[in-house]
């Protein structure tokens, strides 16, 4: 019996679909600890057993939101099972994504360095920029 060939980029497509569906399902949750949540990315294991769902929060405490989302993971997985056309629906693990915070911190550091450089250039009379 011939084995089926692997579908190229299937894991990425499944992760993208999970991201879209989970984002829609989170809006239906009634838990007040879940504020304005944005699903940033989803990483699915090769066997589709587990999925890390990275999220950011505009309003609310990230730790409380993560706890609430992880408590609702069973409900979300069950709802995904009804929506997705795959044999194995992964167990969802929610993690707060700090990428936005890090980007803001780096942006502030770059701005500070540029301001310091401009101030140093102004302090040196007769200095020209290269």
Curated annotation (Swiss-Prot):
- The reply to whether Cytoplasm figures as a keyword in the UniProt entry is yes
A biological process (GO) of this protein is: maturation of SSU-rRNA
Cellular localization per UniProt? Cytoplasm
Has the keyword Kinase been applied to this entry? Answer: no
Q: Which InterPro entries match?
A: KH_dom-like_a/b (IPR015946), RbfA (IPR000238), RbfA_dom_sf (IPR023799)
* Gene Ontology terms, MF aspect: ribosomal small subunit binding
What Pfam families does the record point to?
Answer: RBFA (PF02033)
Report the transmembrane regions from the record: none
Q: Look up the domain of life of the source.
A: Bacteria
Cellular-component GO terms for this entry: cytosol
Q: What keywords are assigned to this protein?
A: Cytoplasm, Ribosome biogenesis
UniProt function note: One of several proteins that assist in the late maturation steps of the functional core of the 30S ribosomal subunit. Associates with free 30S ribosomal subunits (but not with 30S subunits that are part of 70S ribosomes or polysomes). Required for efficient processing of 16S rRNA. May interact with the 5'-terminal helix region of 16S rRNA.
Q: State the family it belongs to.
A: Belongs to the RbfA family.
| PANTHER family assigned to the protein according to its UniProt record, in alphabetical order | RIBOSOME-BINDING FACTOR A, CHLOROPLASTIC-RELATED
**What interactions and quaternary structure are annotated?**
Monomer. Binds 30S ribosomal subunits, but not 50S ribosomal subunits or 70S ribosomes.
- Write down what this protein is called: Ribosome-binding factor A
Q: Which organism is it from?
A: Methylibium petroleiphilum (strain ATCC BAA-1232 / LMG 22953 / PM1)
């Amino acid at each position: 019996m011939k084995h089926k060939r692997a579908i190229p980029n299937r894991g990425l497509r499944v992760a993208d679909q999970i991201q879209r569906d989970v984002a829609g399902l989170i809006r239906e949750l009634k838990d007040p600890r879940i504020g304005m949540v944005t699903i940033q990315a989803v990483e699915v294991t090769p066997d589709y057993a587990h999925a890390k769902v990275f999220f950011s929060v505009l309003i609310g405490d990230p730790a409380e939101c993560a706890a609430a989302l992880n408590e609702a993971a069973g409900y979300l997985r069950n709802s995904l099972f009804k929506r997705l056309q795959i044999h194995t629906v992964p167990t969802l693990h929610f993690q707060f994504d700090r990428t936005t915070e890090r980007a803001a911190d780096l942006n502030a550091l770059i701005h500070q360095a540029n301001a310091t450089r401009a101030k140093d250039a102004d302090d040196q009379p007769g200095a020209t920029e290269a």
